[in-house]
Amino acid sequence: MEAPAERALPRLQALARPPPPISYEEELYDCLDYYYLRDFPACGAGRSKGRTRREQALRTNWPAPGGHERKVAQKLLNGQRKRRQRQLHPKMRTRLT
């Protein structure tokens, strides 16, 4: 009589699938190549501020058409904060004023 391991072997071979065919890109590029393609600076010196394509995409106002609104809102908040500080701690008077 056959051993259980010998009987299970043909079933395992039938269940095992052949590896998927490798595409042209996967055959051509390895992990390091993909890293350089993704993270290499987008353009020449001086134009990208030393940022990679990925960093530029992460830190851009392009998706928000009103990206300048953040700057305007920050100016308003800073002005309100300064006004409150002046009310809490008025400037000391000097003899010159």
Curated annotation (Swiss-Prot):
In terms of domain of life, where is this protein from? Answer: Eukaryota
Record's note on what induces expression: Up-regulated by p53/TP53 in cancer cells. Up-regulated by DNA damage stimulus or starvation.
Provide one Gene Ontology biological process annotation: cellular response to starvation
**Protein's cellular compartments:** Nucleus
Which Gene Ontology cellular-component terms appear in the entry?
Answer: nucleus
For bias type Basic residues, the affected ranges are 80-97
Q: Does the keyword Nucleus apply?
A: yes
Record-annotated membrane-spanning stretches: none
Q: Which UniProt keywords apply?
A: Cell cycle, Growth arrest, Nucleus, Repressor, Transcription, Transcription regulation
Q: Where is this region: Disordered?
A: 76-97
Q: Which PANTHER family match?
A: NUCLEAR PROTEIN 1 AND 2 (PTHR17149), NUCLEAR PROTEIN 2 (PTHR17149:SF3)
Q: Which family does it belong to?
A: Belongs to the NUPR family.
User: Briefly, what is this protein's role?
Assistant: Acts as a transcriptional repressor by inhibiting gene expression at the NUPR1 promoter in a p53/TP53-dependent manner in cancer cells. Involved in the G1 cell cycle arrest, and in a decrease in cell viability and cell proliferation. Plays a role as a negative regulator of the protumoral factor NUPR1.
Kindly provide the name given to this protein in its UniProt entry. Answer: Nuclear protein 2
| Provenance organism | Homo sapiens (Human)
